[in-house]
Design a protein with these regions (language model features):
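Phosphate-binding loop of NTP-binding sites
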Residues: 37, 121-204
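N-terminal leader/targeting and accessory segments in enzymes
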Residues: 2-124
Length: 204
């Protein structure tokens, strides 16, 4: 597969992880960022119009005025990392009811928005913040048990004969324009996917 892109080897710029992607965006009100999220409870968030400019489910992938979405995991709840997220610049936290109770004990001043499903909410929030980039792109997905990665490389090679430089998001790497980004996970979280799509829109 490496041979398919050998001709671009000297011009590609390698980025470490998808979480390093920072597409161009503008701050929007929190209420707009959460538009379309199901089961919202604003009772612990006194200011629905505070502005946010990014979102992440990881406390180590947070910048100033971003939303931290704390997701319950199999072993521990993401709210455990609230302090780290706030220190990094998180302006509010989105989590479930269990997470909200723990968050109030850890940091009673942080605005908290309670949702039924934080992971699903993160997808809607990211799409809102990054202005629904998929709507401006032609996208295709490859599913199956075996051969998905090989198929995506072959398809990208074929599509390059018609389109300028199709982006690729897979389990091995992500390619957007002249950027090559290592895939940290088999399946990226929704905010990362939306950032990848937003970057692809910028590169068009």
């Amino acid at each position: 597969m490496k041979k398919l892109f050998a001709e671009q080897a000297d011009t590609l710029k390698v980025m470490t992880y998808a979480t390093d992607i920072r597409p161009i965006t503008s701050p929007i009100p929190l209420s707009q960022a959460l538009e379309g999220v199901q089961g919202l409870d604003w009772s612990l968030c006194p200011d629905t119009e505070l502005t946010v400019s990014g979102v992440s489910v990881s406390s180590i992938d947070i910048e100033d005025n971003w939303l931290f979405v704390a997701i319950p995991g199999l072993v521990q709840h993401g709210i455990r990392f609230l302090h780290a997220a706030v220190e990094a610049g998180a302006t509010a936290v989105v989590t479930d009811r269990e997470g909200s109770e723990r968050a109030r004990e850890m940091n009673p001043d942080i605005p908290i928005v309670i949702v039924a499903d934080p992971r699903r909410a993160s997808a809607t929030i990211a799409a809102n913040i990054y202005r629904h980039p998929a709507s401006a792109l032609k996208t295709a997905a490859v599913t199956g048990t075996n051969g998905k990665t090989t198929t995506t490389y072959l398809l990208r090679s074929i599509l390059r004969s018609t389109f300028n430089d199709p982006a690729l998001c897979g389990t091995v790497e992500i390619r957007v324009g002249d950027l090559v980004i290592n895939s940290e996970k088999t399946t990226s979280e929704a905010p990362e996917v939306e950032r990848i799509l937003a970057l692809a829109r910028e590169k068009e």
